[in-house]
Amino acid sequence: MSTFQIHYFASASTYTGRNTESLPAPLPLSSLFDTLEAKYPGIKEKVLSSCSISLGDEYVDLVSDGEKSGNEGLLIQGGDEVAIIPPVSSG
């Protein structure tokens, strides 16, 4: 079975209790939040709604509630790395 790595930072790591985990690939990018919500109930609203997502070394838009992001056709492939990056504040 092919897998991809997902990296959790800050509040995403705290919520999941993990820094990284492997998930089955391929996975449509548009299904990522629903997949994580099934594993970690409440994460979508409490954490993911304000996070950025990177696939490899590029940020990607992931829009929910039926809106279009232009990334609906992207597939997360085996060996890919995804990062969940909460907002960063600076002073």
UniProtKB/Swiss-Prot annotation:
Pfam families: ThiS. Gene3D superfamilies: 3.10.20.30. Transmembrane segments: none annotated. Changing A10D: In cnxG24; impairs molybdopterin biosynthesis. InterPro entries: Beta-grasp_dom_sf (IPR012675), MOCS2A (IPR044672), MOCS2A_euk (IPR028887), Mopterin_synth/thiamin_S_b (IPR016155), ThiS/MoaD-like (IPR003749). C-terminal thiocarboxylation occurs in 2 steps, it is first acyl-adenylated (-COAMP) via the hesA/moeB/thiF part of uba4, then thiocarboxylated (-COSH) via the rhodanese domain of uba4. It is found in: Cytoplasm. Pathway: Cofactor biosynthesis; molybdopterin biosynthesis. Changing G91R: In cnxG4; impairs molybdopterin biosynthesis. Keywords: Cytoplasm, Molybdenum cofactor biosynthesis, Nucleotide-binding, Phosphoprotein. GO terms for biological process: Mo-molybdopterin cofactor biosynthetic process; molybdopterin cofactor biosynthetic process. GO terms for molecular function: molybdopterin synthase activity; nucleotide binding. GO terms for cellular component: molybdopterin adenylyltransferase complex; molybdopterin synthase complex. Changing E21K: In cnxG100; impairs molybdopterin biosynthesis. The modification 1-thioglycine is found at G91. The modification Glycyl adenylate is found at G91. Heterotetramer; composed of 2 small (MOCS2A) and 2 large (MOCS2B) subunits. Belongs to the MoaD family. MOCS2A subfamily. PANTHER family: MOLYBDOPTERIN SYNTHASE SULFUR CARRIER SUBUNIT. Acts as a sulfur carrier required for molybdopterin biosynthesis. Component of the molybdopterin synthase complex that catalyzes the conversion of precursor Z into molybdopterin by mediating the incorporation of 2 sulfur atoms into precursor Z to generate a dithiolene group. In the complex, serves as sulfur donor by being thiocarboxylated (-COSH) at its C-terminus by uba4. After interaction with MOCS2B, the sulfur is then transferred to precursor Z to form molybdopterin. This is Molybdopterin synthase sulfur carrier subunit. It comes from Emericella nidulans (strain FGSC A4 / ATCC 38163 / CBS 112.46 / NRRL 194 / M139) (Aspergillus nidulans). The lineage of its organism: Eukaryota, Fungi, Dikarya, Ascomycota, Pezizomycotina.
